[in-house]
Each structure stands twice: as C-alpha cells, then as structure tokens.
Amino acid sequence: MPINVAVAETLRELRQKKGVSQEKLAEAIDSHQVYISEIENGKKIPSLSVIYKTAQFFNLSLTDFAALIEEKL
C-alpha cells in the first residue's frame, strides 16, 4: 500500500473512532478542513508538524502514530 493511502486510512480511522469531524480536527491542530480532507483522500502527505500535532491530539507518541501507519504498509 502506498504511504499516502496508509496515512489517509490511519488518520480517518483515528478521527472517526474518536467521533471528531475533519473541521474540529483541523481547528485543534491549527490547520484547515480542506487540508485534512486532502490527506484523508490520499492527495496530500502531511507535514511533520501536522503529523506531530495530530499525534498529540489523539494522545499518541510520534512512534505510536508511525507504527499505526506502518502496519498498513
């Protein structure tokens, strides 16, 4: 599986499991809903800053977040 798809699926699963909209996630990590949508659709790969803020939002370390993505590769 391509990395952009693995990131997309992981982010979508975490977000939906927590019951958070793309808009709420974007607001929490100082981003935009459109950017979150593009990531979840595999069109963009998030910056390290966005990955870090997203991991924090979901109470995950960068290592744990990366491991979830790696499981899909």
Residue ranges and their predicted role:
Residues Q56, D64-L73:
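Short, charged recognition helix plus adjacent turn
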Residues T10, S21, S47-V50, S61:
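Residues that mark the N-terminal boundary/hinge immediately upstream of a DNA-recognition element
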Residues Q16, E27, Q56:
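Alpha-helical residues within the helix-turn-helix
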Residues K43-Q56:
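Short, basic-rich loop-to-helix N-cap that marks the start of a DNA-contacting helix
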